[in-house]
Amino acid sequence: MKKPVLVVMAAGMGSRYGGLKQIDPVDKEGHIIMDFSIYDAVQAGFQKVVFIIKKENEADFRSAIGDRLSNQLEVSYVFQDLHNIPEGYEVPEGRVKPWGTGHAVLSCINEIDGPFVVINADDYYGSHAFKMAYDFLTSEEKDEDVYHYMMVGYRLENTLTENGHVARGVCVTDEEGHLIKINERTHIEKHDGGTAYTEDDGKTWTMLPEGSVVSMNMWGFSNSILK
């Protein structure tokens, strides 16, 4: 069975941070969040990472991030091109923001020939998440044409911050833990009575139950998703 590949969506990093060289380290040794994700992934069993980046950021990304990781695992790069879309679709005039997760994954089609896990470049997932994802995709021999997919979910209260609001995908699952749908909530905050979200700039708030499962955008797929 082919080993799972880690796919890291990093095409938006430059715009969010004002350039790759401005990414703030999170410890005294100069590590960034992605360093911890790569370490945890390697410990879980991953041996290859594919970085999805913008073509114009390639040199900076290699020197700031990619080259120093190449002694830990195989490193590949693909480019998320705004205009690389399926036939029959058009890019809206004036759009410069990269498309979402689905388009990012489509960019990897020539680099992945087996199962894979997709994460954001700038979110912290924890070592247990990578182990769960890897084990799910390697637990037994599976037909790569079968829709064998997963998402790592988190308890909402464990993903909040004391410094403002967060955006999270609130999951709806059935009794067996199967994902039915995700409701995107772009403004979630802690309140005295619990956790709530607003969709009208704070005029009204809707409480979210304690223990709600949310997505941090960590997905695992068999290769069938690319066929």
Each language-model region and where it sits:
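Aromatic-glycine-rich donor-binding/catalytic loop that engages nucleotide-sugar donors
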Residues: 224-227
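A secondary-structure boundary/capping signal
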Residues: 9, 120-121, 152-155, 221-222
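Generic secondary-structure boundary signal with a strong preference for alpha-helix termini
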Residues: 24-26, 30, 112, 134, ...
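Conserved N-terminal catalytic core of the sugar/cofactor nucleotidyltransferase
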Residues: 1-14, 28-120, 125-132, 139, ...
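Conserved core of the sugar-phosphate nucleotidyltransferase
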Residues: 127-219
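A conserved hydrophobic position in a structured secondary element of the catalytic/binding core
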Residues: 53, 220-221
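Conserved catalytic-core motifs of eukaryotic protein kinase domains, centered on the activation segment
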Residues: 19-20
